């Protein structure tokens, strides 16, 4: 289990160092804005969601709903949208 964790953590670290806006196709975003949004994605990955979370969070230059879900999760206001309402 520790080997699997190490590999996942290593992949996450590599993905952190290998990103600029141009590398993921975001040509209309400043480096400062990219760094801020990318840091949010990395935090989501570190929360136990892994490298796939980071990739999906960066999808479509952070304009995908997945990025907003990540930010909501970090802020503690995430609400599952696909679950049916609870009947009392």
UniProtKB/Swiss-Prot annotation:
Residues 1-18 form the signal peptide. Expressed by the venom gland. It is found in: Secreted. GO terms for cellular component: extracellular region. InterPro entries: Crust_neurohorm_sf. Disulfide bonds: none annotated. Keywords: Secreted, Signal. It comes from the Eukaryota. Belongs to the arthropod CHH/MIH/GIH/VIH hormone family. May increase the toxicity of alpha-latrotoxin and/or other venom components. Is non-toxic to mice and to the cockroach Periplaneta americana. Co-purifies with alpha-latrotoxin. This is Alpha-latrotoxin associated low molecular weight protein.
